[in-house]
Amino acid sequence: STVARVTDGSLFFHPLTAISGVANIGDDTNWCGHPFAQANWYAFGRLAWKHSLSSEQIGEEWLKQTFLPVTGAQTDTPAGEVIQKEQIDAQLSLLNSQVLQKSREAVVDYMMPLGLHHIFAWGHHYGPEPWCDIPDARPDWLPPYYHRADNMGIGFDRSSTGSNATGQYHSPLCEQLDNVNTCPENLLLWFHHVPWNHQMKSGRTLWAELCYAYDRGVNEVRNFQKVWDRMEPYIDSERFRDVQHRLKIQARDAVWWRDACLLYFQQFSRQSIPYELERPIHELKDMMEYKLDITNFECPPYGFSK
């Protein structure tokens, strides 16, 4: 069944139901630090009450309630031109389709695509550290335990020939996940240790597909910057500059993630990054030596940059 049928009471015929969640709130005035992180809280609340809503509907609701001027208020550009509500609606629609609806997959692509997982930095988890090796730490706290990269391939074998985590699922999902050729590619490296030259649905090798995914994530974030800059005439300057600044940090961090992961895993694949893709701009040695001096409860003003 689904979580939705539990929360609406239809699965177990309960007249009263509840749902709880965990999120990254802090002591900032807006709770979440990043203005757009509030959209996740809003989505959670809306789905708790009406699970049939689509992500597009929720995104549209949140954007209009967050950025539309108060009813009756006049919105002017710096040049004194009056902006019509239809103009703002069109820009919010673009923001919804090109940023809100794509933001999750963009982050997955430039951080941990194709089912990679737990390859972030020790402790605070900000930034990439697939090479992390802490003396005397539990193996399952360290990235190499999860990515299992070697000269043969990459990924954690949770199939019936490995830890058999796939056996926890009912048929036919069990069989689908257990087969490297039918396992959804966004989960592939979670369930399988896959050879670097394994052919993907795109026709590319696994190594090339990994490179394309990281590159796609970086370019998506750069597009977020372009879409957001279109919003300048339509919202207050304080929030515009705040989000613009945060997107600059995200764009730099995306390149940091891409370069760190591809250069590190390239040591095992021993293959070139496809020549049509953007070249790394950082040195692996520099990134491996870099340490962020932050706790688990704060975000840095910037990530790696050298």
Task: List the predicted regions and their residue ranges.
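Catalytic domains of carbohydrate-active enzymes that cleave complex glycans
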Residues: 2-69, 84-305
